[in-house]
Amino acid sequence: MIPYKQLSLADIFQDCQNKFNNDKPAFLSLLETHIDIDEFIPISFRNHFYASTGRSRKYPLRAFLWALIIQRIFSIPTDQLLLTFLVYSKPLRDFCGFTKVPDASKITRFKQDFLDDLQLVFDKLVDITEPICQAVDSAKADMTIFDSSGIEAFVTENNPKHANRIIRHLKAYAKANSFDKNYDPYKAAYGSMPSHASANPEIKQLYINGHFCYVFKFGIITNGLGIIRHIAFYNKNFIASHPDITVEKKSDSPDEDKSVHDSRLLIPTLKDFFLKHPLINPKTFLGDAAFDTAALYPKLLTGNTFGDHKHFDKAYIPLNSRAGLEKQDYTINENGIPCCPHDDSLPMKYEGISKLRSGVTRYKFVCPKIKWIKNVSTGRSQRHCTCDDPCTASSCGRMVYIYPEKDLRAYPGAIRGTEEWNNTYKIRTTVERDINHIKDNLCLAGRRTQNEKTLHADLILAGITQLITVVLSDKINHHEFIRSLKPLIA
C-alpha cells in the first residue's frame, strides 16, 4: 500500500520555487553568484542617476548596466533585439532587475546622459583587474600595446557604392587619357573624397583594413594579455585638451596620413592613461612602424614624460622602411646591427650587454668570423679571427660597442632581429585581435547611428564587458576565459 502524504500550500510553493531556480540558465546563475555589479559603480554615478531633482526612476541603474553588458556578452547586435529578449525571457528580465521593459529611447538616453559616468566605471574596473592580470602573467601584464581604429558611423559616405562609383570613374578617366601604370586610382579617390561626412564634420575619413570609411576614430591600449587598459575617443574635446597635437590636411597617401596621425596621438594618449592609473607602471612598449619617428623614442624611454621618473625601459617598434638608420664608420643593417665593413650582408655577432662604472649601458658586437680556441697551456679560450681579409690588426677581430643612449631609435632597449625581439614583438598583434573582438563580438560594428555620444558609450561598454569577463574568470579560477566567456555560454 502506497502511503499518502498530505500536501500543504507551503510544499506546493517550495516545489514551484525549486522548479524556478532549477530552470534559471546556468550562465545567469554564475553571474549572479560571482559578480556584484554594485561594487563597480562609483558613488558619483549613483548620485547622478538618482539625483534629488527631476522625476523618480522607473528603472534601476544596475538593470540598465546589466542589460547592456548581457547584450555584449551574448553578441546581441541591436538595442531593439535586446529589448525583445527581455520581453520574452523572464529569467533574463529578473536577473537584470527590470519589472517592466524600457523602450529603446530609454536605452539611448541612458548612454548619452551618463557617458562620463560609464567612463568612471571602466576606469575603476581597470584598477580592479590589474592585480588579476599580474597574477596570470606578470611579463605580459607589464607590456603596453597601442593601436587606433574607428567606429563606422551610419552615413551615406559609408555605403560601398559611394567609394566604388568614384574609383570606377577614375579608372575610366585614366584609361581614356592613357595614363601610365604608376597611376593609382585608389589614392586618387582618397584625395578626391571629402575629409569628413556631410552629416557631421566629426566623422572623419579614414583608411582601415584596406577600405575607405568615415568613422569616429579611437585609440586603445592593451597589455600583452589582450586586456584593455585604456580607451581614448579622438573627438574635438580630446584635441582641445591636448593643444600640442597638430592637425594637418590630408595628403594623397591614406597609409601615410594614418601613420603620421597615430604617431602624434600616442604620447597624449599614454599621458592620459598614466594620469588615470598612477599605480600601473608597465616597462615595455609595443607598437607598429607608424611610431618609428626619432622624436618619439626619447619621450618613451627617458625623462619624466609620464610622471616622475616614469618611462618605458624597452620599445619594440620595427623600423619604418621609408627611413633608414644613420650610418657610422661601420655599416648598419635594417635591424640596427653593425655589419662587417667588407661585407654588408654579414651581420656581426651580438655578445651581450655590459655596463660601465658610470652605469651607462652598452651592447657588444664582435666579428662574425671569430672562433674560440682553447689555449692548452693556460686552459683558457681566446678569440681568434679566421677572416681572410681582416679589417683590423687585432687577432681577436673587430669589436663594436653600441651606446643606446646616443641613438634610442636604433637601440630602443632591445636589439632588433634577435630571438628576444622576434618573440616579444609577436605579442603586438593582440591589440589588433582585441579591436576585432570588440567590433565583431561586443557589438561595436554595424551600429545604425551617427550620434557621437551613443557610439562613444558603446565603445566604453565594450571595454566594461571585457573587464567583467576578467573578473568572472578569476572568481571561478578559469583564467583561460579571461578574454571571452563564449565557452561558458555554450
Predicted regions and their residues:
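Short amphipathic alpha-helical "interface-anchor" segments enriched in bulky aromatics
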Residues: 35, 86-87, 329-366, 404, ...
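Basic, short loop/linker segments at the boundary and entry of helix-turn-helix/winged-helix-like folds
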Residues: 27-70, 74
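Low-complexity, serine/threonine/proline-enriched polar segments
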Residues: 150, 174-191, 329-397
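Major-groove recognition helix of helix-turn-helix-like DNA-binding domains
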Residues: 96-113
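Charged, often Cys/His-bearing segments associated with DNA-binding zinc-finger transcription factors
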Residues: 1-45, 476-490
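Basic, amphipathic alpha-helical segments enriched in Lys/Arg and hydrophobic/aromatic residues
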Residues: 423-490
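Polybasic low-complexity intrinsically disordered regions
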Residues: 113-285, 289, 294-302, 306-312, ...
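DNA-recognition alpha helix
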Residues: 80-95
